[in-house]
Structure formats: C-alpha cells, structure tokens
Amino acid sequence: MKALLATDGSPGAIEAAHKVLSLLHPDVKIDVMTVIPETENPMDTAGGMEGPVITVEEADQAHLIDERHGRLALRSTLDAVGASETSEMIEGPDAGRVLCRLAAERGVDLLIVGASDKGWFQRLVHGSVMEYVVHHSPCPVLVVRHAGSD
C-alpha cells in the first residue's frame, strides 16, 4: 500500500502525520509532500496596467521564501513524527490539483490531508486544498481534523 501525506508544516498537518503513523501498518510506504506556488513571471501584467506587476528580483525573492517555507514544512513534519519517510517539494499553481494529479500518476492508495483552521471567508476567497482533494482525488482520502479547530 502507498500513501501520500500532504503537509504545509502547520500543527494540523503534523497532527495528521502523527495520526497516520498510529493508524497505518508499519509496512505502508508513506511519501510526505508539500506544494509551493509556482514562480511568478515578472513580465505578467495586471489587467489594465502597463508593465510588469513585480520585478525579477521580487519574483526571485518570493520564490526563495516559498522554497524555504516548503523545506521547513517537510522537515518540521518529518522531525515531529520521527519518521524517515521520503519527502518531496513540488511547484504548482494549485496544491489540490497537484496532489490529485500526483496521486493518480503514482498509483497512491490513500491521500492524507489535515483540515485547516481557515474561516468561511478565507475558504470562500482562497479555496481549500482539503475540500478540493476530497472531491477530486482518484483514491480514498483521510482528512485529519486538528484537535484545536471547532
């Protein structure tokens, strides 16, 4: 059996990792993954504006911050559970779509996500990775709710 654990390094994601390790058989192969935003093209323009929205330097700096955050998310999740699972950081425009695509490509049997503490307005504006994955995953999804959420 193959499982894919999505993490953003948050307490909910780390709690999901702990729960999964206590529920699954030790022989299950668990891949830990985080998805970071794709690098913004500084030459893109905003509607009605002339010229680039951000400079090349700003785009590079933003990408470095995203990569640092991604590495930290993976490391904090693996360290918290004391696991030596394989981990990977992927770039993509939408984390939910990337996770579902990779689950299909890799023949994953179970996709694990933590439920975030986003309020209804944040979910409305930004969407929810968990909600997308639950509705579009090619395999069963285990959603672990953070103990501190309502």
Q: What are the residue ranges of the model-derived segments?
A:
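Short secondary-structure boundary segments
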Residues: 34, 114-116, 145-146
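Solvent-exposed polar/charged
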Residues: 22, 104-105, 135
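Glycine-rich, Arg-bearing micro-motifs that act as flexible, cationic patches
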Residues: 110-136, 150
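Structural beta-alpha unit
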Residues: 76-111, 149-150
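Short, acidic/small-residue loops that bind anionic groups at enzyme active sites
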Residues: 136-146
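A short acidic, glycine-rich active-site loop
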Residues: 52-69
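Small/aliphatic-rich secondary-structure junction motif
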Residues: 2-56, 85
